[in-house]
Amino acid sequence: MVHMAEDKQDVGGAESTPPSILAKAFLVIGAFNERDRVLTLTQISRKTGLPKSTVHRLLQRLGELDVIEEHGAGYRLGIRLLQLVSSMPVDGMREVALPHLAQLQAWSKESVHFGVLRGNEVVVLQALFAVDHARPIGEVGTRIPAHLSAMGRAMMAYLREDELTELLSGPLVGITPKSITDPARIHEELKQVRVSGVAVQKDGVVLGLGNIAAPVLIKGRPMGAVAVQFDSSKQVSESVINAVKLTAHRICSDTTQMLAQGRGDLFPFDD
């Protein structure tokens, strides 16, 4: 599902062309996350790979725009970003999903996630972590190849055939020795998802960890997916499977109700 290496927000190929000023600015913004809310110039330079002089100039300009602000001896994201984020359509999905994710996390005592499909990747929109996790895995904004993710497969199972063909046509990267990258095997697993209503992955992203996910379907289309993390050495209980499916169903019901109330602008998916 949603597991990442140290200080990485994307899993995939590296950019081959030199980054533009805009790209560098986004690198600086992307250095911040739920774990690193305040960073020094040196920390930002180390995380982005940019020279300190470049980071300093970018921080000055972003500060003038209220995108970044000083905080003690470091920096944090500014109020302008909050204003922009609050106007994003995906924020409506997070609003609907959050109370149901909270119930699922409180019941399961495991980390839970809600993600959406963007191209050939899953993007984590909401994450609630188990209290005993020393390091959160799968923070908000994390991206992972859809074919490796339980959430990704849960949504892929309900794509149109042409969409699925396009998604699987490119190079399918693996992260661990147990990552599934064979298109034929992925197709077979997607058939099972349509029968069972859930997708399961074990050890495909991080050895020792697995996830079970259920899609949130609106008008037959995958709007998002809910996932629960578990120890891959253990079997997933029927109660967990049912809880994940019920959570996805509740998010679907609330979303359908909001659409009926004319709030379709919050949910950017096809009719």
Where are the regions that the model predicts?
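Short loop/turn motifs at secondary-structure junctions and domain boundaries
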Residues: 106-107, 203-208
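Amphipathic alpha-helical effector-binding/dimerization core
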Residues: 76-170
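N-terminal helix-turn-helix
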Residues: 2-94, 252-253, 257
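Short, solvent-exposed recognition segments
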Residues: 6-8, 133-205, 271
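Sensor-regulatory modules in signal-transduction proteins
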Residues: 216-218
